[in-house]
Amino acid sequence: EELQMAAVTAAMVKELREMTGAGMMDCKKALANTDGDMDKAVEYLRENGMAKAAKKAGRIAAEGIVKTVVEGTKAAIVEVNSETDFVAKNADFNAYVEDVAAQALTTKAADIDAFLAESWNKDSSKTVADALAGQIAVIGENLKIRRFAQLEEANGFIASYIHMGGKIGVLVDVETDVVNPADRKSVV
């Protein structure tokens, strides 16, 4: 074990951290267990992350944030929960939830189980559930995609807003013949 650890350089650990977002000690351990093979270390971290995610699955995720995305005549809203408010304010977690919202905009899934089983838009080799497990491993808390909804309005527009620092989100469907975005304020 000592010889393996010596072969792992700080530069290798840094590179693996940048590739995966995993913690320093996890990256060091992965490289040591795979004789410094970067590809095998990534796979080791992925498998280890799934195991960590499974261990955290029983913990209550009662905090979290709501994100919305509006593109043209279509919109989506998602709620993703975390265990602590601290994580809910984390920039990486927020970016992940934005990705989940983008996924929800294009999904054909009727419920959460179908949503989790579909191919992840950001990496088609993974499912949404795989991406979630990866985030759980990186962030170190149980996370849960609690719910999502889509809205489509062909004869008007959709607006969105977020209340209370991401705790409450709203999609508003406005049916109107006003098509110019600059004129929409007069409608609402």
Show which residues each predicted segment covers:
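N-terminal assembly/interaction segments in proteins that build large macromolecular machines
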Residues: 6-188
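Short, Lys/Arg-enriched N-terminal segments with co-localized hydrophobic residues
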Residues: 1-4
